[in-house]
């Protein structure tokens, strides 16, 4: 075993039986902590007839009530303000505030103690070290430091490893690119959308990232593109760098990441318990190859614990063990979408990630696209807006044919295809909402 490959060689290579014992022990501890310190959790578990002494096995864990975003929204704004009675520590122990982006509704407030934030940084350090970050790396963060968790932990994890961290802050995209060139930055963290957008901007100002910049490692998060092969390929070719996916959320923390093998997402099973639940039956999925929604427990967050949080991201286990030697299990294909993003169009279940895979696999199209679903009478009508790269403008007819055929093959649907002028569709630095469902809501 090459110990230099692991941030924590002991935990990352722990035999399965020992790892499961550790998870059961940590679940009991966080369950007990929440039961004894949070009115919200005490009532939730009391109503279910459960108390700490009942947790003796993984089967017992599966009986513990799940929590959802809607439950957290309901208690926000109440005492202790603004977090509500999910809080497990006195307000004076809260040192950090973050909130979700609100893309699925009212933002969720997240409280952390200093120790909680140290845990978040440690969890991210596992990811960056696995991706080859080392002392001597000069890491650029082209992100606005704000109330969203975004790449805050990337910054502090990089420092913890010994990297030099350069905050891009309020600089615009062009200035960020020039600063990366000036300082010879070797690594970067951003959303997939912004990674592609920065490469586009760089070319406009005469900079070719693979040859004119020294970025050789890119960590992406915030969107599913890092585990979509066509999108990853575009990013790697645009920058001449390895691109690694990293996943997490404000409420949970940074629970999964790719290592240098790029064989799938490792789940940090020393810090988190990840369960996969069948969307239709509610039963557990333990075997590889079957997709379900993710339920996560964070072991090391004391202020506002997340215990059996129904994330609704769709994942499935990979049957293979990674060649890196870690015993943390792999997910096959990363985040495959969200259970609440999958929508029925013309009677067909449609995942937005399937459309992204098709668009990004056609090199004559730009990185940007937009999908719009409306009602025409009683019929669903779906339009895909794309941009052709200028040098291929004369090939619009053949590109349309390929696009229509691939969309039909991958999604079983027909689309109205609209070609727009290159650069005219919206660009974003953060999470992009490219799927717009404008059909009337049924009540």
What residues fall within each predicted segment?
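Nucleotide 5′-phosphate-binding alpha/beta core
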Residues: 1-99, 105-122, 126-130, 378-385, ...
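Conserved S/T- and glycine-rich ATP-binding loop of Class I adenylate-forming
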Residues: 34, 100-103, 139, 188, ...
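AMP-binding/adenylate-forming
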Residues: 114-127, 138-197
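Short helix-loop-beta connector
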Residues: 133-137
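Conserved helix-loop-beta element of the AMP-binding
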Residues: 138, 205-226
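AMP-binding/adenylate-forming catalytic core of the ANL superfamily
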Residues: 188, 295, 299-413, 430
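Adenylate-forming
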Residues: 195-214, 233-236
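Conserved AMP-binding/adenylate-forming
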Residues: 220, 225-227, 231-321
